[in-house]
Amino acid sequence: MKKTLTAIALLLAAGSAHADDKVTIEFAYPYSHLFDVTYEKILPAFYEKHPDIEVKMRATYESYEDAANTILREAVAGELPDVTMQGLNRQAILVDKGIARSLEPFIAEEADFAKDGYHQAMLDLGTFNDEVYGLPFAVSLPVGYYNMDLMAKAGITSTDQLPKTWDEVADVCVKLKDAGVRTPMIWGWNITGNWFLQALMWTQDKPIMAGNDFQLDTPEGLTALNTMKKLFRSCDMPNLELKGTLAGFAAGDFAMLYWSTSALGTVERTKADFDLRTHEFPGLTADGPIGLPAGGNAAVLVSDSDDPKVLKAAWTWLKYITSGEGAAEVARTTGYMPPNKAANEVVLADFYKQNPNKETAVRQLPLLREWQAYPGDNGLAVTQVLYDGTEGIVTGEYDDMQELQEELVEEVQDLLPSGS
């Protein structure tokens, strides 16, 4: 897929303008298995409108952590791309380090920026110190994926019977195991940025960070850990890698998958012959979560070029992919939601009615909360500490959740800046 995308970019760019007239910019993005098909759709339309710009694709990032680490290394080496796609929770570190460039000078030159769908709530996701540094490209939320053919083995045959709470999920797992389903459920604990741990915290309306205060030491934090333990034990959940998880569900091996809506396009394209339904993310009560963290990524200008032509070309590409027309391909090819208002209200007016599985996340939009980054220079290290601790629950290394809570809080607080 990656070779195909690069070939399309080069072929289209070469055929539409003389090489001497072209401005070449470099671009990097994460998750090739999700986004290659999206950029394959976007590039031809972009080149048709902008034949004087060539977009050179760099190797894709494996994750948002990889994306941030790669940019930090490239900044030191003087090898930055012009535009990078970064996790919404990883923009701040690039702003703090002076790597991301403010988009305010470019926005000021746009006559109809708001009319083009760039509303304030969208801009807020990429605003730091009262300036816009990133334009959100794709927004995701956690949802439930269900193989209804397998769910029928637990007596669940319609959407309104699907579990609404994690206790109900655990009960369904027991029924499915009794019915011979080997892997009843997979829960996305290992999705980038401790996203699902934050989801359990926001479910209780509790952010994981309050300033520099790590709030896993609260009753809500202990509830989050105990909820994961109950799910993993009740469902005999194996410890799978990310790509193996999606492949396994698409093959029909699991009855329930709790994951990002971002993977829906991939699952729909690759799934076996079974009835797939998505449904709202369960909560601790039947009322559902109070909030959920917004996942996704934003386009950030990190070019170290001083050439006005390069910077203008980079802005042209950055604006196009986040525009109504460009961002609409996000919804068509993935399960992400485009934050651009024009994409949702104009380009995709009837799309969600015709694609009910993709509408699930849209119904959860009122729950959107911040996907928090951990402050200071050790933010990525904090992510790893929590990843390791959660994996220990999956593997059975940790059984006493209060003891694990104390251990994680002590280790994380030592990595965070002091003061509120």
Specify the residue positions occupied by each region the protein language model found.
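Extracytoplasmic/periplasmic substrate-recognition and gating elements
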Residues: 21, 48-49, 54, 154, ...
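Long, aromatic- and glycine/proline-rich binding clefts that accommodate carbohydrate-like moieties
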Residues: 279, 332-388, 392
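Short, well-ordered beta-strand elements
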Residues: 21-33, 53-60, 83, 133, ...
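Glycine-centered hinge/linker elements that transmit conformational signals in sensory
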Residues: 170-176, 211-239
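Short, polar/charged alpha-helical segment
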Residues: 33-54, 386
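Extracytoplasmic "Venus flytrap"/periplasmic binding protein-like
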Residues: 45, 50-118, 127, 153-155, ...
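Hinge/lid segment of periplasmic solute-binding proteins
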Residues: 88-141, 170-172, 196-199, 203, ...
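Extracytoplasmic/periplasmic solute-binding protein
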Residues: 128-137, 142, 152, 167-213, ...
